[in-house]
Amino acid sequence: MKIFNWVHKRLHQRVVKDGFAGNVKKSELETNDKDTQAFLKQVGLVNVDGLDGWRDGILTIGTFGFDPLKPSTHQNEYFVLESEEDDQESHGFSHSGNDDDDDDDEHYDHSVEDEELNPLMFTTFEHSFEDIGSNFDAIVQKPADVILTVDGVPLTPFEGSSEISTKPDQSANDQSKNKKGQRITLADLFQADVPDVGQLKLDSGKVQPEMEKKMNARTRSGLAFAKKLIPRVKDDSSPIKNMQRLMRRMLKRKIHPAELEVKIHKSDGQKQPSAVELISNVENDAYESVSLLPIQGAPCVH
C-alpha cells in the first residue's frame, strides 16, 4: 500500500505557509525518495534503465491508499503537519492575548458549537430531542385565562380553533354518515358545485325538482336552436338525423350534379334529348303555327 499512499500524498499537496516552508519541502522530498526506492526494490526494477526518466511519476491504478485494515491515524498521515501548524498558531495567539480575551473566545466557540447541530447526531439522538421538547412544553404551559393582546387590543381566536368550536365538526358528521351506509351519488356532487348551495337541501342523494326544471329548460333551448336551423323540425325526436340527410343531399348536388340529373331522368323513364332533336322540334312547331294562319283564296276548312 505504500505506492498508493505515495500517490495520495502527491495528489493532496497542501499550501506551505511562510514560517515552515523550507523544513516541510525537505521532509516531503525525503519521504518521496524513500517511498520510490522502496517500491522499486520490492518490484526488482532498480537497475532497469527505462525507469530512470519517470521514477517520480509512476502511474498507479487502485484505491488511492485507503486501507480498511489500518487505523484512521495511518490513513490521514498527510494531515499531521497541518494539524501541528494549526496548534502552534493557536498557542501563539493565546499567549499574545489577555486572559479575558481567551475566556471570550472559549465562550464564543462553545456557543457556536451549541448552535450548529451535527446531522449525524441529530438523526441518532432525535428521540431524545423530542422527549426534551415535550417535557419543556409540559413545564411551560400557557394558562387558560391568558388573553393575547397587540398594543392593548385583544386578539380574537381564529375560526375552527378549540376555543370557538363548541359544535361537532362537519367532517365528523360526514364520517358517521359514511359509516351508517349512506352513499354519495353524482347528484350530491353536482349540487355541491352549484353556487346557491345554501338554498338547496340534500335529501339522501335524490335530485331536487329545481334541478330537474333547470335541466328541462336547457334541453328545450337546445331544441329551439335546432328548429332555427331546420324550420320543418317541430317536435321531431331526431333532428340530428334530418340535419345529416340534408347535408348529404347538399354535398351530392354540389359535387356530382351530373349524376343526379341522370338518376332523375332514369327514374322518370325518359331520355335526355339531344341538341338536334330540340332544333327539329322547334321547326315542326313553327310550321304547324304557320299552317294554321288563314290564306287568301284558299277554301276554309270547317
Swiss-Prot record:
Tissue-by-tissue expression: Highly expressed in flower buds. Expressed in branch attachment sites, vegetative buds and young fruits.
Keyword list, A-Z: Growth regulation
Keyword Lyase part of the UniProt annotation: no
Positions of region (Disordered): 82-115, 159-180
Disruption-associated phenotype: Pillar tree (erect shoot growth) phenotype.
Gene Ontology BP annotations: morphogenesis of a branching structure; phyllotactic patterning
Disulphide linkage map: none
Biased segments, Polar residues type: 162-175
InterPro entries (UniProt xref): TAC1 (IPR044989)
Sequence motif IGT motif, location on chain: 57-63
Biased composition (Acidic residues): 99-115
Signal peptide residues on this chain, from the entry's feature table: none
This protein's record includes keyword Glycoprotein: no
Function: Involved in the regulation of axillary shoot growth angle. Promotes horizontal shoot growth.
PANTHER family attached to this UniProt entry: NAD-DEPENDENT PROTEIN DEACETYLASE HST1-LIKE PROTEIN, PROTEIN TILLER ANGLE CONTROL 1
Family per record: Belongs to the TAC family.
Protein's recorded name: Protein TILLER ANGLE CONTROL 1
Name of the coding gene: TAC1
